[in-house]
Design a protein with these regions (language model features):
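N-terminal propeptides
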Residues: 1-228
Length: 229
């Protein structure tokens, strides 16, 4: 959760609580998804109305519209609505994330939905630690785990050239707001700065202050945007 918070993907409820066991809505999932992608194009979709229940005045309109029309990662329901406040299911979540990773989603969609996507998510590591029935609602904590898994997931896709030769490409997903990373061990100096072991610099200033107790001793990747922050 802390990694996602530093990237701006997750937030508290206004009083500093994450509410890990609360169900995540379709609108909230779209916000997490689009924030992770880090595209500035999302602002263009703020005043667009695609669904009658997600008008331009809706708090999540820009995120829903961009995910649907801008990236075509998901769609509305057969009745033309989006149902932004309905809990998102595990099957819906992994389908969207596998499309984000540009894996062999076309092959998965040829089977019984969402089993093909669930199998892809398991094979790529996206669903590690979160394996549910396709129709089960996911919690905020489970969604956070899925998004953390996406950051390190290896996406595999296949293509066939004009001569009939098939090639497979494997890559690690790298969102627009995370252009580089360093494997480090954090040693907190204060709420604004962390000293590290294994990074290119001895210390880093944090964009979002954290308590020393949260940072101290953590091991993992530092994620950097285009400005090196």
């Amino acid at each position: 959760v802390e990694v996602l918070r530093l990237l701006g993907v997750v937030e508290g409820n206004g009083i500093g609580q994450f509410n890990p066991y609360a169900q995540l809505t379709r609108a909230e999932f779209c916000k997490m998804l689009v924030t992770l992608m880090g595209s500035s194009d999302v602002l263009r979709y703020k005043t667009v109305t695609i669904f009658p229940d997600v008008r331009a005045s809706h708090w999540a309109a820009r995120y829903v519209n961009y995910a649907v029309r801008g990236e075509k990662l998901l769609a509305g329901l057969p009745d033309g609505t989006f149902q932004p406040d309905r809990a998102i299911s595990y099957g819906e979540a992994v389908t969207i994330l596998m499309r984000l990773l540009r894996t062999d989603a076309d092959a998965a969609s040829g089977g019984i939905w969402p089993e093909g996507y669930i199998d892809l998510a398991k094979a790529s590591g996206v669903s590690a630690g979160v394996e549910l029935a396709g129709g089960a609602a996911i919690s905020r904590a489970q969604a956070a785990q899925l998004f953390v898994n996406v950051l390190g997931a290896k996406a595999t896709s296949s293509s066939t050239d004009k001569d009939g030769e098939t090639s497979t490409t494997t890559r690690v997903y790298n969102p627009a707001n995370c252009v580089s990373r360093e494997r480090v061990t954090l040693i907190a100096l204060n709420g604004n700065t962390a000293r590290v072991s294994g990074g290119k610099k001895n210390s880093y200033d944090l964009v979002r202050p954290s308590s020393a107790t949260v940072l101290n001793g953590l091991k993992g990747d530092l994620l950097f945007d285009a400005d090196g922050k």
